[in-house]
Amino acid sequence: MPEAYIVEAVRTAGGKRGGRLAGVHPVDLAATALDAIVERSGVDPATIDDVIMGCVSQGGEQAMQVGRNAVLASRLLPQSTPAVTIDRQCGSSQQAIQFAAQAVMSGTQDVVIAAGVESMSRVPMGSTAMFHMKEGLGHYKSPGLEEKYPGVQWSQFMGAEMIVRKHGFAKDDLDRFALASHQKARAATESRAFAAEIVPVAIETPEGPQMHTLDEGIRMDATLDGIASVKLLSPEGSITAATSSQICDGSSAVLVMSERALRASGLAPLARIHNLTVTAGDPVIMLEEPLFATDRALQRAGMTIDQIDLFEVNEAFAPVPLAWLKHTGADPDRLNVNGGAIALGHPLGASGTKLMATLVHALKARGGRYGLQTMCEGGGVANVTIVEAL
């Protein structure tokens, strides 16, 4: 079977809710990542077969095929470039990578951009469902769903609390994990570890035009006492805003190519895609599926967890990567080495390609060979992607 290669991977620096990227339309934010990956890779825009854009809240400014709109807003992509927008919840753009790789491995396409965008400031999380319910246009929970899951609330927060109880984590475990995320993100920023992946975004500020290049959510002065003092989201629970991923604006992109296209273009890949896995499980606890998806990915790849040099496990809530570590026995020093979504933000549909950008560049910088990325996703789904650095 033909191989699929990652040639380049980029992301914008994250913007806080109502922060430095809040003034940028998500279509233009996505176009920025598309243009950057064309410029940095040197790929001929005319050779791009498709753009697959992940986006969760596909309403308002992210409605009407945001992926295609981003292509049309791009400075560098011709209007003849096709695009599609997909929603696999938080794993949307990781699934975009997998669809891109599958297209290349099937031989039906040679050059595909997987990308993602989410402006959580301008299109708030859950707003698409809330709008329709407010207007009397119905609820996504059908009679059939209610029959199978009577009275169940589909809640990430409840799922996170269920993981805390199931795995016996103390609140202090969550707080310490969150502190480490900020500390690693601060160290990565100060050492310019993100320089190879971050693309500048032109913004307007009260001081005039600027370029946004630094992740806005990192608490450079984070302390355990400060994190521990944040109010609980539920009086009976353990999760706080400080141990949850940050609402974030951002976009990201990954260029996937076939070996045939690499030879024709003379471009050099960063990594080879080694395994593509997606599984689904309990939709109520919801966020635990990365544990079992990782088991399946390693089994199918014929690998053990110790063979993986770096892991990117999305920090939707602190108990998710903590449960993943406990289940897999992975070395915690290899996990989210530059921090995660607790510090850097979780721009929903953009997080999959964002994490891949961090993973492939970290593998290159650290001389690692294999990297594994996984994310929990709404509905109890999880993607796993294993890559080999080249």
Task: Label each residue range with its predicted role.
Residues 1-74, 85, 162-171, 181, ...:
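Conserved active-site "lid/cap" helical segment
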